[in-house]
Swiss-Prot record:
The keyword Phosphoprotein does not apply. Keywords: Amino-acid biosynthesis, Aromatic amino acid biosynthesis, Glycosyltransferase, Magnesium, Metal-binding, Transferase, Tryptophan biosynthesis. GO terms for biological process: L-tryptophan biosynthetic process. Homodimer. GO terms for cellular component: cytosol. Pathway: Amino-acid biosynthesis; L-tryptophan biosynthesis; L-tryptophan from chorismate: step 2/5. It comes from Novosphingobium aromaticivorans (strain ATCC 700278 / DSM 12444 / CCUG 56034 / CIP 105152 / NBRC 16084 / F199). Belongs to the anthranilate phosphoribosyltransferase family. This is Anthranilate phosphoribosyltransferase. Mg(2+) 2 binds at D220, E221. Its cofactor is Mg(2+).
Amino acid sequence: MTLLPDPQHPLEEAEAEAAFAAILDGAVADEAIARFLVGLSDRGENASEIAGAARAMRARMIPIKAPANAIDVCGTGGDGHHTLNVSTAVSLVVAACGVPVAKHGNRAASSKAGAADTLEALGLNLDRAAETAEETLADLGICFLFAARHHPSMGRIMPIRKALGRRTIFNLMGPLANPANVRRQLVGIARPAYVPIYAEAILRLGTDHSFVISGDEGLDELSLAGGNELAEVRDGEISMRRVTPADAGLPESAVTAIRGGDAAHNARALRALLEGEHGPYRNAVLFNAAAALIIAGEAQDWHEGVEEAAEAIDKGLANALLNCWIAALE
């Protein structure tokens, strides 16, 4: 079995790529993987480690063809807030605005319901979603890239992640290994201090336009509770700024106002949102959708993004898209 480097010492990008290549290829014992992941997490992963690990994951994924302007909206998870599925709802709303969305996601690793769990509860056939991803992306402007299907090397890692029950570098790697090789991303991470580090990892890997976001309370999406850290990665540069709900013309609300439950609960909430229900969940989706629309070049500012997203919901476009998507995969 391959010996992993000491996680207490920072790794260069090539070292990290080699270590995770060994892990993903099954050349490392489970106990050693668990110790390595915990060691990295306790020390704090750096940009070169995140980028190197993502490169190893990319090299082993099953890719799909996608439009050059396709976008992904996802969070790293592991924030412990167990909110409703904001990025999943945002993906539907943004796609309904005409932006191709290659939604990359998985079942829950440390929460009650991940994107895959909730979409399945809504009636989406996950197996068919994986088999027809290119087709549905071309025909409907949205697809779900089920990580379990596109990253077969991750199969033996999931039990380790489940057993650890905590955030690891795999939360950080996932969004950077989208099988559609998207060049535009909205990525939420659970630790505000990590925003510039994660942005540097994205810069190393290459992007056309991406936002890395984190709510001050450690939410892996733009939060309505107050301030948010935002790093914009574009034209080979990183720019940092603060963003609040007021910037988008939205009211503040506590994180607990969008607390989720199991997959069935979250699916009902998402469906109610798309059917026009107002409240904090809708506002959270509008806030994050506005960010995605700015990245996609469909909105010039936060207010315009919120207006476009609200229109996609209120005209029933996002709900109709979900229905068409479910029907197409039956």
